[in-house]
């Protein structure tokens, strides 16, 4: 694996890079607005990305994650953290793409649920990698979650149960995509990668 941005450039620059990427998302929507048939869909897309990134999504999940350090949390709190911290943005990205491409309500719903499951699987695997990974694989020091006493799936459920849950979620992503035929294959392959990744 490669060193993470905060290892290469420092924490301040890594945070600014995240800020820049977040604003770039809005720029990309604005730049492509003219290609969308329904102008209201563009406003909806901007609102959805903002919600997923802000206090109703990623920021809100991160706040609960930080506030939970060193505490025993329930399975519900852990799921809240992961669904908001990680899954909200993945779900929103897929939802916005499906809506702007003109997907009907059932297609958008299927993509939304696939995004939710994919985001949750991604975070569970991330938790597992923090336990089992190496600096060479991850690009960052493993074991940080345990040292900070963070709420993680392995800490609450154990490694094997965490692996089973991640695999179950990935399989559910692929089931949700079955109705899309070949158009869903790239996202199914991404789901497999999320489960098999080493960094």
Provide a role label for each language-model segment.
Residues 1-175, 182-195:
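Mg2+-dependent prenyl diphosphate-binding active-site environment of isoprenoid biosynthetic enzymes
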């Amino acid at each position: 694996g490669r060193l993470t941005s905060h290892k290469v450039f420092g924490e301040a620059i890594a945070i600014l890079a995240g800020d820049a990427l977040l604003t770039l998302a809005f720029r990309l929507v604005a730049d492509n607005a003219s290609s969308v048939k329904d102008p209201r869909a563009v406003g909806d897309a901007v609102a959805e990305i903002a919600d997923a990134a802000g206090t109703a999504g990623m920021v809100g999940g991160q706040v609960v994650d930080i506030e939970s350090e060193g505490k025993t949390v329930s399975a519900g709190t852990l799921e809240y953290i992961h669904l908001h911290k990680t899954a909200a943005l993945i779900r929103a990205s897929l939802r916005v793409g499906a809506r702007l491409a003109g997907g009907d309500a059932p297609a958008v719903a299927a993509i939304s649920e696939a995004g939710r499951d994919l985001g949750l699987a991604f975070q569970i695997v991330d938790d597992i990698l923090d336990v089992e990974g190496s600096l060479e694989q991850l690009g960052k020091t493993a074991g940080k979650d345990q040292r900070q006493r963070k709420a993680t799936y392995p800490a609450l459920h154990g490694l094997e149960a965490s692996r089973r849950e991640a695999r179950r979620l990935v399989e559910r992503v692929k089931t949700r995509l079955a109705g899309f035929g070949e158009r869903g294959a790239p996202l199914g392959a991404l789901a497999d990668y999320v489960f098999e990744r080493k960094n």
